[in-house]
Amino acid sequence: MLNNSIHSLQKRLLAVFVLVAFIFLAIIVRLGYVQLIRGSWLTAKASQQWYRSLPLSAERGVIADCNGNKLALSYSTFDVYVRPNSVQNANEVALILSSKLGLDYDKVYAKIINKKLSEVCIKMQVDEATCNDIISCNLAGVVMSKNNKRYYPYGDLLTQVLGFTTVDNVGQSGLELYYDKYLKGVSGLSLEESDVSGKKIDNTAKKYIPSISGMNLNLTIDVNIQVFLEQALNNLMVEQKPKTCTGIIMNPNTGEIVAMSTKPSYDLNNVPRSDVQTLLDTSRNIGVVDVYEPGSTFKVLTMASAVEAGVAHLSDRFYDPGYRIVDGEKIKCWRLSGHGSQTLTEGLCNSCNAVFVDLALRLGKDRMYDRFKVYGLGETLGIDFMGESGGILMNKSTAKTVDVARMGFGQAVAVSPLQLITAFSSVVNGGKLMQPYFVKSVKDGNGAIMYEKSPNVIRTTISTKTSDIMKTMVEQVVKQYSGFNAFIPGYRVGGKTGTTQKYENGRISGKYIASFVGTFPADNPDYVILILADEPSGSSYYGSVVATPYAKQVIENIIKYKNYPADNLEDDLKLVEKNIRIPNVVGMEINKAVYMLQQLGLFVEIEGEGSEVREQFLPAGEMVSKNSIVILTT
């Protein structure tokens, strides 16, 4: 009996011992877990309760042009915060802050008396002078945190290319958005000990986690040439009154974007954030993201393709009665009476639709679509910019012969301005389709290169032999034909004009896009320039008048800036003397108009039986040689 009691007691003691041992083991395991596994997390949580932090904004990187001129930089500002639990006189603080910061008193007061918040931001990016003024008032509970504000020294220059940032210095559009991860840097913190109510504990040291400045961008843009382009586009907006206009200047040998602009624009230091529609419309980089039917400027690509494929030769002749009939449809040339017999070169210089219908049909649908791919049409080119368009190509399987015929002269196909200038550049640079780009390099604050872009040949489009032929052709267009408004005595300029009808709901709208693509120097181009005006509403809508003269303005400024020497000046001056500027005869009585034009040495063709001139082609203002034909519509 006694033995049984002892045995039972031993079992109970053992159970108690095991239980106590298990509890101690659990405590040890828990302590180990808390100390070793969760220690860092718990320390951080404690720090959050006992430390109050202020952000230290990283300085955003500088954006500079190819010569080091700063296009976007940051300067120091301050964010004003209030710690409600430290405020001694809420009314006084609200009154002073609202007055000096230009804010509503009631809104500031409501923030200050909200004791549930340990800290509240009153206003961001306040200038240093204003902050010093506030500091001098010795307001308890008011603290400042250093920040940065973006500044664009050139105002409305490169509006769509550079883009802008939020007040928090986050890229919102343009290169500021595309390269935001490089530009933004890493923010730091200023930490100070505080009690449970958020008040700073006296005699405690602050801790700092320093910010890391953003990296700097070095662009392909030359700000001087950018100024030339924007001046020309501003002139175009005033004189030709288009809805918008766009310009791109490319180095055809590297793909570097030397200048790019769209008008209208806005000052990047005063972004119209309150007008969302205006902001969206004027922030859109039309040169990269929009598409249009290129019209006659596209004929250069068709011509180069035909010569390269061996289906067209300089010795070929074409007869143009004023139209071609394809699939039962009549495709008219702009000159309704036709150009008659002409050479291949004359076909381009005359911008004769019939010739390019023939060339497109000689190439055929398969080769035409192959050429589109070769030129980078229907796909993006990989430029370092958000929203790049790949253009629009009709589905090959549904394209009819008449569609292919129209593609030959730039209809039934849509491209972005960037695609057109890149493809055009390949025609005059020896046949290399270069990838376009904006940023040459990314460097850290010490100047170390973190990223560097080298010219990239996407593919070969044509042979150097074909390229040489095309360079000569486009120079002839400028010397004696529709591109003469870009002619500069003593300098070799090439180019092709374009006038495109716009369609709305499948019908001709009566609105136009006028364009010009120019090359300089024509024999070995350093620059290819595209000028495009959407819906000009001045005295003309032809590319030769609306776009070409403004490309000439840019080239003339580049000549002075880069000190290009003149050549064959005397011969070119004689050529100018032989040319005539077409007068405006629209609205004149037909007999008077004919007499005026004939007195200038021009031939006249009349379409219609009216007594007054309703429309004329060649357009007023265009420079042409004597014996050129002006078509008057009555």
Stretches with model-predicted labels:
Residues 1-272, 291, 366-378, 387, ...:
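Periplasmic/cell-envelope proteins involved in peptidoglycan metabolism and beta-lactam response
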Residues 72, 195-208, 247, 252-296, ...:
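Beta-lactam-recognizing serine transpeptidase/beta-lactamase-like catalytic domain environment
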Residues 155, 523-525, 626:
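Short flexible coil/turn linkers enriched for glycine and charged/polar residues
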Residues 291, 543, 573-614, 619-634:
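Extracytoplasmic Gram-positive cell-surface binding/anchoring modules and repeats
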Residues 449-455, 545-584:
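Short, gly/Ser/Thr-rich active-site loops of penicillin-recognizing serine hydrolases
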Residues 451-452, 537-541:
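Short small-residue beta-strand/loop micro-motif enriched in glycine and branched aliphatics
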